[in-house]
């Protein structure tokens, strides 16, 4: 219901604004599981109830959205999809990398959005296999659709 969705969104924003994401070992362990053992990640997600699935996907999305501010000096991305893929890939690199980017002590400084990021094919033009991590949030959203027959509610309507 709308009240529960708003509460989940408020929790995600509070989780980010009060830096609880930095110490959320469970969240980051699940992110790491998705990059090193995708089958185990899928199994774990499948065992989550609706609230846990929504909480995870929305927190992941919030972390992606916060990268926008840090990436703005790099100029416009090649496309909206490549920017979204890059943000998902960056969150999937884990807590230390994400924190360094957000804190301005590492990460995308100096990257040129017009060239592919080393180790990341922005436009998938080479046919290279997709790097682990880009689709972590999508896995949760896909499971939601399979389970409930509808798109996962969009968090930006609530924060």
Task: Give the residues covered by each predicted segment.
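N-terminal domain-onset segments
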Residues: 2-69
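Generic preference for hydrophobic/aromatic residues in regular secondary structure cores
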Residues: 31, 75-77, 140
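Core of folded catalytic or high-affinity ligand/protein-binding domains
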Residues: 43-119
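Basic, alpha-helical nucleic-acid-binding regions used in initiation and control of genome expression
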Residues: 95-159
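Generic, low-specificity signal for short hydrophobic/alpha-helical stretches with a mild N-terminal bias
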Residues: 13, 38, 42, 80-83, ...
């Amino acid at each position: 219901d709308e009240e529960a969705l708003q509460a989940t969104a408020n929790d995600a924003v509070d989780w980010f604004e009060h830096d609880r994401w930095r110490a959320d070992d469970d969240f980051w362990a699940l992110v790491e599981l998705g990059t090193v053992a995708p089958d185990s990640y899928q199994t774990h997600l499948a065992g989550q109830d609706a609230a846990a699935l929504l909480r995870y996907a929305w927190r992941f999305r919030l972390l992606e959205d916060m990268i926008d501010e840090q990436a703005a000096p790099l100029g416009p991305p090649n496309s909206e999809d490549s920017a979204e893929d890059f943000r998902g890939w960056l969150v999937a690199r884990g807590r230390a990398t994400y924190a360094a980017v957000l804190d301005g002590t590492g990460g995308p400084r100096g990257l040129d959005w017009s060239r592919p990021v080393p180790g990341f094919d922005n436009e998938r033009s080479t046919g290279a296999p997709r790097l682990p991590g880009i689709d972590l949030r999508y896995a949760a959203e896909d499971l939601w659709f399979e389970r409930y027959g509808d798109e996962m509610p969009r968090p930006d309507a609530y924060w």
